[in-house]
From Swiss-Prot:
Keyword vocabulary terms for this entry: Hydrolase, Membrane, Mitochondrion, Protease, Serine protease, Transit peptide
Residue span, PDZ domain: 278-358
InterPro entries registered for this protein in UniProt: DEGP_PDZ, DEGP_PDZ_sf, PDZ_sf, Peptidase_S1_PA, Peptidase_S1_PA_chymotrypsin, Peptidase_S1C
Main location: mitochondrion
EC number: 3.4.21.-
Protein name: Protease Do-like 4, mitochondrial
Coiled-coil intervals: none
GN (gene name): DEGP4
A biological-process GO annotation: proteolysis
Amino acid sequence: MLFRFLQTLARFCRFLLISVLGFRFSPLLLLGYVKLQDENKHNSESALASGTDAKQPEAAENVTSSSIDFAVNSVVKVFTVYSMPSVLQPWRNWPQQESGGSGFVISGKKILTNAHVVADHIFLQVRKHGSPTKYKAQVRAIGHECDLAILEIDNEEFWEDMIPLELGEIPSLDESVAVFGYPTGGDSVSITKGYVSRVEYTRYAHGGTTLLAIQTDAAINPGNSGGPAIIGNKMAGVAFQKDPSADNIGYIIPTPVIKHFLTAVEENGQYGGFCTLDISYQLMENSQLRNHFKMGPEMTGILINEINPLSDAYKRLRKDDIILAIDDVLIGNDAKVTFRNKERINFNHFVSMKKLDETVLLQVLRDGKEHEFHIMVKPVPPLVPGHQYDKLPSYYIFAGFVFVPLTQPYIDSTLICNCAIKYMPEKAGEQLVLADDINAGYTDFKNLKVIKVNGVQVENLKHLTELVETCWTEDLRLDLENEKVVVLNYANAKEATSLILELHRIPSANEYDYQWQS
């Protein structure tokens, strides 16, 4: 748990919010968001998603004027009013801001865009090409891991003359592509052209996950986010991010990821995440390592280092198992499998495309003998959640202490980087202090995890709240990391809590996001 004096926190917080606002609390990621924002916010983000003056490649034969005319009638501009919650003061939101992005119409009277275009939204509007009218929109479903969102508009006038785009296939290398959208620099639709450079497993900046992505040299700038990438008369993907460290490197979400998202929403009514084996592993490129684990000269695979106890793999696989193949496809010593001709891709792509509770067949070498296991896959929450969009953070306030679960946004905001890997997400996370006589002498404690409340091990934030609220002893004792101890007179602390809430204009002593209690 983290203890921080409020006045010091306020000064520190102000600096942090200026420096990380354009990152949407993800400053450690390599790839920047592609989002058109108000002037101040755009300036803070320009280092990540700035444009390039490099000359764009000429159009190839499969990006024709007819395909451009067809696609332009599907593209829309998205206007977003949003307010992000304060990570360090979780009972409040920051002032509203405006941003924008792109989107396009798909079948079923739906609009597809990026999740980061509408994240933390309060109000959404959409304007179609060639129209001055803005239409109110609602988010039907959102997947932050895959950076996709579905919008709906309850106005039949909007849908007149709108042409839905069909999903195509993964483009080939060097195939020409046209990216549509509303990037910075103007108000009308923009079209940039380029070629497919790579198709590989890539880190998605917004959600912090790794999924299949298309790399292109077509210009992708702030505001392009959510716009379609077109090949012929079909959509090859959704523009979503770029590499700020290099020229002409933009990224497109490919149709397999899009189809997985859309199918999950259609079948389950909501997005449920991407499946994973949830293991940590190492490559087997060293011949001495392969010999030690009794791998034959023809064998290739990966070495399991650790397995998440919450996953189905934990019941069947073991540390030091060698995974040789997945669904009868051999895994190389570099953890990659064959993908389209001579292209290779990380084996996790096969797992991520599975539906909830489907199985993968793993061929495993254990103690020199081969085995086969059917492993059920499902989305498994990370130890520390990488994002917390579209909701207030969970917290609990007692006697001026503010308890919150550990999250990556909190780590980013407080510059705590080394503790992320050692806490489980269901544990009570950090704590800061609202100054009061009741907690005098404790305000200098920081970066300390709460271990016990009155001798009982803390399981999660809700459990901590219950332990505090049902205290029957005169003193409340909190045992912290590094053998630190907090003792409060319970009756006095209970009375002080109400006064502190009133003094700091905090509407409630607690807020729960129940995903933390599972």
